[in-house]
Amino acid sequence: MFDHNKLNFTVSKHLMFNVDGTPVDPAIGMLLKRTDTQQPLSVVSEGYEPVQYGDIVNQVEVGLQESGIDMTDATFDTKVFHNGEQLELRAKFPAHQQAMGRFTDKVVPQFVFRTSHNKTWGNNGMVGLWRSMCWNTLVSGHKLAYTYGRHTKGFSVPVFAAKVKNAAEFISGEGMTQMNEWYNTMVDRDTIY
């Protein structure tokens, strides 16, 4: 699935030190560093709890596997930027592609997610069928599940993984048939209450 070799590191908080060697009060900030290279990634608050990239990916993968989504010819793209400061994940599931409504082009279900350890990207992810999307969670299509928020405030990896699983179950089950029926149901002013 996703490339775990690119995620083979963890991060942890460390005290910062002034030029004269005295420690900086942790209430002012702490240094977030990779544990393998000791490379600094960001200054974070004392109460900040780092979320490891590997934990996110592992739980999302379990959710996808348990959903029953057809992984035939699925593509998984794992991008890590700036030595681990940022992560972007993308997956496409062509076995479930659909032609929606009057359109004849095929729309492929997708999963996208990005986050960062350097505060540039919040936790931002979506599952659905769309022709185009932006990271403000706007899509030209259908977003079946999403998360959007600050890095760790209110972000729960298990809750997000469950949303991904539910959306994938919808895609792999009767959901797509229902969605096509909705698209093909003609309505007019007289039939709308």
Predicted segments with their positions:
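Intrinsic disorder/low-complexity polar-acidic segments
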Residues: Q65-Y193
